[in-house]
Every structure is written in C-alpha cells, then in structure tokens.
Amino acid sequence: MSRTIVVKNPRTSGKDEDKAQIPSQDELPSGSSGAKTTNQIISEFRALIKDPIKLDEAVNYLYETLVDDAAVGIFIETRQLQKTGSLTALEGTVEETNDMCDLPDCDIFGMSTAEKTAKCCCPNCERMVAAVRFAPHLQTCLGLGRSSSRAALRRLTVSSRSSSTSTGGGQANEKSTDDEDWSLDSRPGKSTKNSRNKGSKKNQKNKLK
C-alpha cells in the first residue's frame, strides 16, 4: 500500500490540497531492507519536478517551515537564557568608549607631547640635574665611572701617602728628640763620674804620701 502525503501551503488556503504518492515499505524492492536507495530518491525527485506548479508550492512551503522553525528555536533559546540569567554573561559587559582628544600639543589619549626638560635631584650633591645628564653626573659624582674611579684611586693613594709620611715624620721627630735628651742627660753623668774618680785617685795619693 502507498502512503499519501498532503502538502499544505498557507498562501493557497481553501484550494485543493496537493497530494504526492510515496510508495509504502511493502512496495519497496527486495534487498532494500526498509531504507530508500539512491535510485528511489532520484526517481521521486524527478516525479516532483515534472509538474512545475507543485514543485514551486512544495519549495515555498518547505522554505517557510524551515524559517519558522529556526525563528521559534531562537526565540525559545533567548527566553530560556533570559530566565536563567545567562543572557548577560553571554553578551558580556559593554566596554567604555574612550573619546579621542583634539587638544593641541596632545595625543589622542590627552597626554601632552610638548618637550619638557625634566630634572632630577642628585642624592649625593643634592643638585638639580637634567634627566638626560643624570646618569653620567651620578656616575662621576659617586666615583663609579672609569675615569672617576682612577681619580678616586689616585686620591686614596695620595691621602694614604700623606698620612703615612705625617705619622712617620712624627715618629722620627720623637726619636730624634728622645736621642737628644738622652745624650744631654748622659754627658754630664760621665763627666761627674770621671771627676769623682779623678778626685778619689788624688785623695788616695795624698793619703799615701
């Protein structure tokens, strides 16, 4: 037995309904196992396109049905997202639009593009130095550069030599003064001893006489 499919067109309401005869499962050829073969699909397609009026109506109905189903599905999904609160998370937050700046001597973000000589304070000498010259000034001021390190080393050697000579000269002066004092103290002692010895010898001779 064959089944009859009725194709309804909303535009042609009240008119005769178009009917297309589709073979039933019993009428299928043996070996098809209930599934349509490519030849059957092609034959049905050829049967439909023989009558251009029926073909146009079927295509229009199919197109309208697909559009309605897609629209209804979108509406239902949007309604469900709105109920569950997932619509806001899906859309995301609206980013703030930054207006472009048209002021003179400024970029589009409003930052000034005018050249300014920035100055920095030296932590060693507390002088205001231009930012361009701050690094070499700090290098020379702290004695960290090549030339400045040599100068600092030279200063250290000179200061160490001067300190050593000053301490050595003081010790030499102290030694010389000590020697002079000792020589002065020792000379009268020798003379007194000699005089005492001479006197004692003379006294002994006089006594012997």
From Swiss-Prot:
Keywords: Activator, Chromatin regulator, Cytoplasm, Metal-binding, mRNA transport, Nucleus, Protein transport, Transcription, Transcription regulation, Translocation, Transport, Zinc, Zinc-finger. GO terms for biological process: chromatin organization; mRNA export from nucleus; positive regulation of DNA-templated transcription; protein transport; regulation of transcription by RNA polymerase II. The keyword Cytoplasm applies. Residues 1-36, 156-209 are annotated as: Disordered. The keyword Zinc-finger applies. It is found in: Nucleus, Nucleoplasm; Cytoplasm. Residues 156-166 have a biased composition (Low complexity). A zinc finger (SGF11-type) spans 120-141. InterPro entries: SAGA_su_Sgf11 (IPR013246), SGF11 (IPR051078). Pfam families: Sgf11 (PF08209). GO terms for molecular function: transcription coactivator activity; zinc ion binding. Disulfide bonds: none annotated. Residues 193-209 have a biased composition (Basic residues). One of its GO terms (cellular component) is cytoplasm. Its main location: nucleus. HAMAP family: Sgf11 (MF_03047). The long N-terminal helix forms part of the 'assembly lobe' of the SAGA deubiquitination module. The C-terminal SGF11-type zinc-finger domain together with the C-terminal catalytic domain of not/nonstop forms the 'catalytic lobe' of the SAGA deubiquitination module. Component of the transcription regulatory histone acetylation (HAT) complex SAGA, a multiprotein complex that activates transcription by remodeling chromatin and mediating histone acetylation and deubiquitination. Within the SAGA complex, participates in a subcomplex that specifically deubiquitinates histone H2B. The SAGA complex is recruited to specific gene promoters by activators, where it is required for transcription. Required for nuclear receptor-mediated transactivation. Binds independently on SAGA to promoters in an RNA-dependent manner. Belongs to the SGF11 family. Component of some SAGA transcription coactivator-HAT complexes, at least composed of Ada2b, not/nonstop, Pcaf/Gcn5, Sgf11 and Spt3. Within the SAGA complex, Sgf11, e(y)2, and not/nonstop form an additional subcomplex of SAGA called the DUB module (deubiquitination module). Interacts directly with not/nonstop. Interacts with the AMEX complex component xmas-2. Interacts with Cbp80; important for promoter recruitment of Sgf11 that is not associated with the DUB module. This is SAGA-associated factor 11 homolog 1. It comes from Drosophila willistoni. The lineage of its organism: Eukaryota, Metazoa, Ecdysozoa, Arthropoda, Hexapoda.
